[in-house]
Amino acid sequence: MSLPAHLQQTFSPEEIQFIVENEPIKIFPRITTRQKIRGDDRGTGNHTRWQLITTDDKALNNMVAMRSTEVVLWIALLLKQQSKCSIVAPQWLTTKELDRKIQYEKTHPDRFSELPWNWLVLARILFNKAKDDFHDPIHELRGKIQDLREIRQIKVLKGLKYLNESHLQLDNLSLLEINELRPFITEIMDKLREIHTASLTAGTENDEEEFNI
């Protein structure tokens, strides 16, 4: 069964979130799953050892409480929900770093600041599921993310004037930003391609008429 036309051109929000949740992120576990800690010959002592059922035994069953490790985001969210870890916010997701990105966007009207491909979706997920793991106030971070997004949207719209039938430069735009633009841009490029083809055809016909004369 084929998908509706509007779903053939873009990812659904659920598909984007699924992709983002399979990316790695750092956590501080609150449990220990490693069966033996190097240099620890005292057995389990007072430390409870957990055994997690998983296909990725290396990552999940090698954790030591309060030692940073890296797991995929969806696992981090499950552990967080059960109060078994704290999620480490990405370095770019602070008020200081976001201020730098906003300033860059304002001073470089023809370029976009370098941000992870999943920055918008990741920020939204962490704001909703791990707000207590941020050092900066959540309302400030939300505001700066919104400011950054609006500035970039304005720059994208201004950049559409350089659109032609074959090419549009979209360096440093995230998956969500491109996904939102894709149907609109695709339609415009199709129209431009039709106009370009028609003009070439008309030019060829004129050349043939001149040659026959």
Swiss-Prot record:
Under the heading CDD domains, the entry gives: GINS_A_psf2 (cd11712), GINS_B_Psf2 (cd21694)
Does this entry carry the keyword Nucleus?
A: yes
Whom does it interact with, and what assembly results? Answer: Component of the GINS complex which is a heterotetramer of SLD5, PSF1, PSF2 and PSF3. Interacts with PSF1 and SLD5.
What biological processes does GO assign it?
DNA-templated DNA replication; double-strand break repair via break-induced replication
Pfam families, A to Z: PSF2_N, Sld5
- Keyword annotations from UniProtKB, A to Z: DNA replication, Nucleus
Q: Which cysteines are joined by disulfide bonds?
A: none
The record's annotation in Gene3D superfamilies points to: 1.20.58.1020, 3.40.5.50
SUPFAM superfamilies registered for this protein in UniProt: GINS helical bundle-like (SSF158573), PriA/YqbF domain (SSF160059)
Locations listed in the record: Nucleus
GO CC annotation, single: GINS complex
Taxon lineage: Eukaryota, Fungi, Dikarya, Ascomycota, Saccharomycotina
Q: Which domain of life is it from?
A: Eukaryota
What is the name of this protein? Answer: DNA replication complex GINS protein PSF2
Stated role: Functions as part of the GINS complex which plays an essential role in the initiation of DNA replication by binding to DNA replication origins and facilitating the assembly of the DNA replication machinery.
Tell me the protein family, please.
Belongs to the GINS2/PSF2 family.
